[in-house]
């Protein structure tokens, strides 16, 4: 052996590992440079490496910054205080002040349709409207009190409604009569249990503000005509809007903006729009707040309420928008919807949005006037007072492009990487994240069901944030422990040339891709009608996730290589910074090797050793692509929809289930962007997450679901049944099961004094209703007892008809309800103990004296609505009418009703009779003079308001607070 050979063998031996491989041991220097060479590196380079290298400290700082920024920016975006400013212009300030005064006067007391306070509000608004209209010659006013806009029509299957309208309608005639008009609409009635500040006093006050604005001297005549509908009785059937469809002015209208309130204060949100063509004009609003997530929620019936938008869009075929307050729902329709719980900024947000939007549409011709564009649903949102809207066809097109382009680029990149870069991914690396993700969701679901729901199922009502935080912490911890546990257990099978971060990014991108396919298919299936308009968020999240994945693959593909010389002059290309561990690998061993060296070095090994530090900075670009924006979007819009839904858990067990599903989904979606980096986070993140989880557990156990700020919402109805002997007088309180209703009722003074029994019965969908004998109401002056409140007199009995069994049976009756506006009739055939519905084919509402009215022949009357020679309203439906709802304006006029019906043929010798059940409703709250004393009209309701705990609010269970029942046979 020559000396050279001996030296070569010695050198080779010094680099031979115990397993016979030719790797350089970690404790032996690889470069010829001295260890001090890195120490003498430029200070700036070292600072950059320390700050932006893929280190635990750098990553941890970015994680904390992202979480904090997500929460703070979302709070700013939804905050009325920070995102909306009061007007500085004197004229606008004056308009706001006047509108606020109007709101205070409207909300002085409860003013449902069946109350004298409703008349007071009507007359008050009429005075203001008359004063403002007189300021401009091109303004005019019409009042439906002339009874020309009453209707009798089918409003539900087998239900017919009679309604007398007293809408207040203003027309601001435009300078160009050829332009179709814009309708602005709000309703001035409230429910019996609410002062109606947000629902819909703010809408009415905003319309008064619009009138103030256009009647001002400095405001010129608009080019487009504006019609304003101050409508009544929206709460129990949208009847004011329905009546307006038959008004002569309605024919001019093509567009509308409806102002509503389904919460109590806060910011007014654009939550529905008929189409993109009209929704895009909301960009003119100075403080836009919008989300088509609510549009999708309404389409899916996740929110159990409706607005006038429904009739304007569906029956009126108008193009328009729905702008409404939406939180908190537990104060909605209760006495807490009052002036004390709102402020001027809330009113200004709706008022300024109405002014800005109206000016943007009425200033001149818009593209929808001249182009017969098809209505195309829109996806829209707002961020920091910037409004974004796109048609659903655009969302569909982008989705299709992404579904094709991203997989194509990714697959080509992967093929090139595996072919030339030798990126090896072991089965453990490939399967551990999907396994961890699925198992974590399974564990989260069981944790939610077996702990959170069982311990405090109503907690989202007051502390949805605590639950979301606990779920988020649990999900992150589960993935952290599972992923690192798998790495620990299967460390021998862990590949050496891989990037765990990139693998997880690609797998999450694939999950979003599958979800995008599902969403796109649904969009196409719904024919782009907006049922899935909230899913544009999925498109944005996929773009961000895919961008991080594609960027990582391209970095792998185009990574610069360095060459290492062997002793026989062979060249070995190596990936810079990541040889054994691969691109982006997270190695942090201490040593003296500089992975940033770029020159070729002559060594006597075939493979280079693993780098001791990873100074690649492209990870930070991936992080910025994926985490901050995705985290903000997921949290901001997830929390927004949760704010609108969380209080609905008081309405049914189904809603409770949906709320907890939304909480789990929010936690998972917000956590997903952080999961690719979970391998690298500092132990501080782990400890903080544990602390948050433990804190959440404690809070879930001890927190109260119902507080004064987040009350328990119960519903009230007092029912007096005159058919019973003696009459029954039951108070019914309805709410969620296991929500302490019985305990609240048993503590009432009247219940304890009379030793009345409180009986509770379970109802469908997790609800319960409790009944007890209540205090007698005093509903009308001069009535001595309940029998004086309601009487039904049969004027023409069908039993005397000679047409049976081959012809129509008919009957007439008169209902006298003292000081009343609302009744409901139910028709059932009564034959030998058998009862059937749908036998009535024609109903007649007599407007004049019965003596001057002829019998209506059902064979001659047309199907649907008609009027006879005396102006009586006739409705015929041969499929059957089961219910007739009556709404009149005259407090003292009796209801005079005629029916024609067909009896069923059976073997009974008894001639059939028609049972008519009459339910009349009273809703007036306050006091009344009776026998020289001032007494409460509905003392049972007043007692509940006074003696219920401060964490309880009361709403009406039906269209009135007191229901008096009586039935007759016709």
Swiss-Prot record:
The protein's name: Vacuolar membrane protease
Database matches in InterPro entries: Fxna-like_M28_dom, M28_fam, Peptidase_M28, PFF1_C, PFF1_TM
One cellular component term from this protein's GO annotations in UniProt: vacuolar membrane
Biased composition (Basic and acidic residues): 25-35
GO molecular function, one term: metal ion binding
Cofactor: record remark: Binds 2 Zn(2+) ions per subunit.
Protein purpose: May be involved in vacuolar sorting and osmoregulation.
The keyword Ribonucleoprotein appears for this protein: no
Binding site for Zn(2+) 2: 199, 235, 333
């Amino acid at each position: 052996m020559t000396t050279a050979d001996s030296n070569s063998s010695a050198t080779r031996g010094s680099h031979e590992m115990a397993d016979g491989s030719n790797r350089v041991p970690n404790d032996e220097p690889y470069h010829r440079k001295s260890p001090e060479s890195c120490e003498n590196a430029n200070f700036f380079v070292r600072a950059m490496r320390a700050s932006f290298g893929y280190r635990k400290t750098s990553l941890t700082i970015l994680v904390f910054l992202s979480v904090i920024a997500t929460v703070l920016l979302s709070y700013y975006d939804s905050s009325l205080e920070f995102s909306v400013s009061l007007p500085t212009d004197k004229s606008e300030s004056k308009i706001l002040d006047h509108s606020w005064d109007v709101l205070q006067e409207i909300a002085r007391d409860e003013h449902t349709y069946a109350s004298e306070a409703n008349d007071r509000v009507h007359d008050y608004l009429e005075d203001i409207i008359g004063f403002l209209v007189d300021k401009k010659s091109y303004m005019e006013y019409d009042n439906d009190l002339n009874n020309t806009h009453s209707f009798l029509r089918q409003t539900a299957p087998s239900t017919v409604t009679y309604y007398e309208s007293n809408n207040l309608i203003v027309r601001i005639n435009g300078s160009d009569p050829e332009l179709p008009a814009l309708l602005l609409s709000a309703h001035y009635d409230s429910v019996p249990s609410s002062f109606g500040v947000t629902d819909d006093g703010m809408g009415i006050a905003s319309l008064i503000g619009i009138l103030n604005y256009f009647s001002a001297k400095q405001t010129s005549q608009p080019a487009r005509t504006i019609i304003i509908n101050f409508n009544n009785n929206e709460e129990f059937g949208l009847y004011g809007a329905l009546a307006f469809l038959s008004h002569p002015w309605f024919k001019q209208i093509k567009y509308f903006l409806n102002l509503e309130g389904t919460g109590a204060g806060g910011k007014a949100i654009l939550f529905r729009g008929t189409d993109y063509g009209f929704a895009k004009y909301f960009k003119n609003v100075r403080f836009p707040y919008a989300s088509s997530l609510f549009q999708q929620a309404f389409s899916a019936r996740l929110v159990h309420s409706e607005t006038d938008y429904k009739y304007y869009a569906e029956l009126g075929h108008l193009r328009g928008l729905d702008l409404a307050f939406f939180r908190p729902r537990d104060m909605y329709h209760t006495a807490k919807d009052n002036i004390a719980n709102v402020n001027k900024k809330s009113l200004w947000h709706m008022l300024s949005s109405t002014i800005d939007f109206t000016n943007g549409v009425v200033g001149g011709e818009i593209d929808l006037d001249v182009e017969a564009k098809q209505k195309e649903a829109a996806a829209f949102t707002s961020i920091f007072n910037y409004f974004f809207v796109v048609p659903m066809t655009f969302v569909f097109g982008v989705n299709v492009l992404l579904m094709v382009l991203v997989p194509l680029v990714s697959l080509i990149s992967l093929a090139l990487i595996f072919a030339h870069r030798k990126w090896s991914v072991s089965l453990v690396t490939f399967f551990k994240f999907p396994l961890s993700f699925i198992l974590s969701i399974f564990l989260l679901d069981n944790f939610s069901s077996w702990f959170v729901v069982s311990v405090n199922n109503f907690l989202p009502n007051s502390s949805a944030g605590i639950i979301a935080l606990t779920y988020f912490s649990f999900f992150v911890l589960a993935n952290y422990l599972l992923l690192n546990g798998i790495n620990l257990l299967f460390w021998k099978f862990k590949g050496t040339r891989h990037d765990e971060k990139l693998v997880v990014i690609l797998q999450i991108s694939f999950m979003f891709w599958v979800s995008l396919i599902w969403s796109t298919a649904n969009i196409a299936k719904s024919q782009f009608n907006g049922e899935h308009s909230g899913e544009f968020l999925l498109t944005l999240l996929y773009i961000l996730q895919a961008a991080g994945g594609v960027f990582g693959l391209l970095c792998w593909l185009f990574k610069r290589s360095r060459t290492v010389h062997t002793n026989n002059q062979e060249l070995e290309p190596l990936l810079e910074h990541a040889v054994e561990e691969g691109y982006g690998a997270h190695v942090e061993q201490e040593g003296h090797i500089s992975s940033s060296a770029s020159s070729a070095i002559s060594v006597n090994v075939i493979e280079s050793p693993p780098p001791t530090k990873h100074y690649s900075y492209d990870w930070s670009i991936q992080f910025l692509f994926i985490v901050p924006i995705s985290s903000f979007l997921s949290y901001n819009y997830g929390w927004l929809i949760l704010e609108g839904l969380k209080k609905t858990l008081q309405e049914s067990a189904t809603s409770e289930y949906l709320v907890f599903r939304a909480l789990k989904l929010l936690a998972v979606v917000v956590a997903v962007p952080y999961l690719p980096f979970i391998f690298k986070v500092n132990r501080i993140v782990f400890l903080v997450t544990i602390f948050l989880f433990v804190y959440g557990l404690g809070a879930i156990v001890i927190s109260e679901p119902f507080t004064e700020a987040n009350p328990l919402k119960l519903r009230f109805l007092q029912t007096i049944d005159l058919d019973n002997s003696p009459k029954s007088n039951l108070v019914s309180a309805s709410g969620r099961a296991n929500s302490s209703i019985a305990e609240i009722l048993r503590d009432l003074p009247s219940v304890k004094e009379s030793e009345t029994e409180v009986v509770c019965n379970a109802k469908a969908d997790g609800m319960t209703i409790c009944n007890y004998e209540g205090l007698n109401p005093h509903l009308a002056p001069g009535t001595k007892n309940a029998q004086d409140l309601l009487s039904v007199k049969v004027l023409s009995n069908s039993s005397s008809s000679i047409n049976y069994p081959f012809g129509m049976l008919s009957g007439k009756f008169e209902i006298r309800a003292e000081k009343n506006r609302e009744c409901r009739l139910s028709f059932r055939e009564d034959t030998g103990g058998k009862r059937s519905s749908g036998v009535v084919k024609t109903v007649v509402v007599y407007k004049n004296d019965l003596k001057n009215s002829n019998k209506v022949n059902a064979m001659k009357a047309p199907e649907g609505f008609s009027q006879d020679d005396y102006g009586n309203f006739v409705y015929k439906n041969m499929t059957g009418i089961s219910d007739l709802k009556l709404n009149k304006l005259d407090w003292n006029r009796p209801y005079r009703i005629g029916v024609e019906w067909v009896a069923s043929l059976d073997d009974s010798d008894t001639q059939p009779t028609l049972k008519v059940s009459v339910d009349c409703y009273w809703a007036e709250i306050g006091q009344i003079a009776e026998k020289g004393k001032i007494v409460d009209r509905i003392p049972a309701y007043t007692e509940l308001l006074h003696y219920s705990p401060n964490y309880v609010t009361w709403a009406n269970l039906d269209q009135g607070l007191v229901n008096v029942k009586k039935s007759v046979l016709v």
